[in-house]
Design a protein with these regions (language model features):
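A short beta-strand-loop structural module common to alpha/beta enzyme folds
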Residues: 33-43
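N-terminal beta1-alpha1 ligand-phosphate binding loop
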Residues: 1-32, 132, 167
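Helix-loop-strand module that forms the ligand-binding subsite of alpha/beta enzymes
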Residues: 62-150
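Glycine-rich phosphate/pyrophosphate-binding loop and the adjoining helix
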Residues: 8, 30, 139, 143-192
Length: 192
């Protein structure tokens, strides 16, 4: 099984990277082939909203990393989307990627309803927030990022098999044993 991890955290040793590392190790120990893409290192131009991709099925802008990542998503059996919460949402770098590859994630029916193009692929969503638990949930911080990623993944046809959220990352810079266990469990659900 091929698993693609989209890591949208700019922090190489932060909580998201640690969580992704645990999931990667668990998936590989269960026979999966895992590739991690660090979204913050991608060279992607912003979408210009020309809407040509909706009728042509490809982006007319010059090729950049967005097309290469889309090909990896299409080849993968499962995807982990991991992002810290920025202002109750996903980071701009991840949103930029999703904006540019919308044509490969979903189409439209003849009456304009979304038509998923990635049906059958499994997905795990991961988010962190500096807002301490349980306020990160009550104030819709990390949950806001999960909500935004969930909307994109659902319209694309992914079956979301798990979500993992962690609050209070400003003070809790390392994963607890319980958090590592949740990450391993999510990785196993991705493979089953």
């Amino acid at each position: 099984m091929k698993v693609l991890v989209l890591n949208a955290s700019p922090r190489r040793k932060g909580n998201i990277s640690q969580m992704v590392g645990v999931m990667k190790d668990e998936a590989e120990s269960n026979g999966a082939e895992v590739e991690v893409v660090d979204v913050q290192h991608l060279d992607i131009r912003p979408c210009v909203a020309c809407m040509k991709c909706r009728s042509t099925g490809f982006c007319v802008m010059p090729e950049d990393d967005s097309q290469r990542v889309l090909a990896k998503i299409q080849e993968a059996d499962a995807v982990v989307v991991a992002a810290p919460c920025y202002w109750g949402n996903m980071p701009g770098t991840l949103k930029l990627l999703f904006d540019r590859i919308v044509y490969g994630l979903m189409d439209e029916s003849s009456v304009g309803f979304p038509k998923p193009l990635l049906k059958g692929k499994r997905c795990v969503l991961v988010s962190t927030s500096t807002t301490p638990w349980p306020f990160n949930i009550l104030m819709h911080q990390s949950h806001g990022a999960i909500r935004a990623m969930k909307e994109i993944c659902r319209y694309s046809g992914f079956k979301i098999v798990a979500t993992v959220e962690k609050g209070g990352t400003k003070r809790n810079t390392l994963l607890s044993e319980k958090e590592e266990k949740r990450c391993r469990k999510a990785a196993r659900r991705l493979l089953s």
